[in-house]
Amino acid sequence: MTTTENAQPRLKTRYREEIKTALNDEFKYANVMQIPGVVKVVVNMGVGDAARDAKLINGAVTDLALITGQKPEIRKARKSIAQFKLREGMPIGARVTLRGDRMWEFLDRLVSIALPRIRDFRGLSPKQFDGKGNYTFGLTEQSMFHEIDVDSIDRPRGMDITVVTSATTDDEGRALLRQLGFPFKEN
């Protein structure tokens, strides 16, 4: 009989072994439970043109499923807006909430593979924190992820990525994400 060990995500192991102690040394927490960590990652893809053509949402759902490894939730319009020819209940986007090992694997792929593949990339803005240590940024197209076949893209779709942390201040959240390998611009 053989015993198989579950492979831990690389970034999760690094967080537990190195990053937690580095953050504790930097901020001098009274309790180890105060050390900030990543709670969840939300990937949202808005498809405004889906109001006119409902088939466009399928491409966004397929792309998000390939990128995240999880089936996206189709988001529907909450209100009708006549100027946008939008009715309540029409599909207008797709969203995935990643937690646990899938979240760590996605963050690892994002930081080590996807972000360096962006043309003319000079780093993420360090000013996009929400005041509670959570970070949101946008990507203009999905082709930087290696799971997406560049030839099969019907149109470029952008996405918003929100990294929710248990940090209480922006400085703690920034320190956590910098330790995880997020490339922030130096001002």
Curated annotation (Swiss-Prot):
Quaternary assembly: Part of the 50S ribosomal subunit; part of the 5S rRNA/L5/L18/L25 subcomplex. Contacts the 5S rRNA and the P site tRNA. Forms a bridge to the 30S subunit in the 70S ribosome.
Assigned GO CC terms: ribonucleoprotein complex; ribosome
InterPro entries reported for this sequence: Ribosomal_uL5, Ribosomal_uL5_bac-type, Ribosomal_uL5_C, Ribosomal_uL5_dom_sf, Ribosomal_uL5_N
Protein task: This is one of the proteins that bind and probably mediate the attachment of the 5S RNA into the large ribosomal subunit, where it forms part of the central protuberance. In the 70S ribosome it contacts protein S13 of the 30S subunit (bridge B1b), connecting the 2 subunits; this bridge is implicated in subunit movement. Contacts the P site tRNA; the 5S rRNA and some of its associated proteins might help stabilize positioning of ribosome-bound tRNAs.
GO biological process: translation
SUPFAM superfamilies documented for this protein: RL5-like
Lineage: superkingdom: Bacteria
Protein name: Large ribosomal subunit protein uL5
Gene3D superfamilies found in the cross-reference section: 3.30.1440.10
Similarity comment: family membership: Belongs to the universal ribosomal protein uL5 family.
Molecular function terms, GO-annotated: rRNA binding; structural constituent of ribosome; tRNA binding
Alphabetically ordered keywords of this record: Ribonucleoprotein, Ribosomal protein, RNA-binding, rRNA-binding, tRNA-binding
PANTHER family: 60S RIBOSOMAL PROTEIN L11-RELATED (PTHR11994)
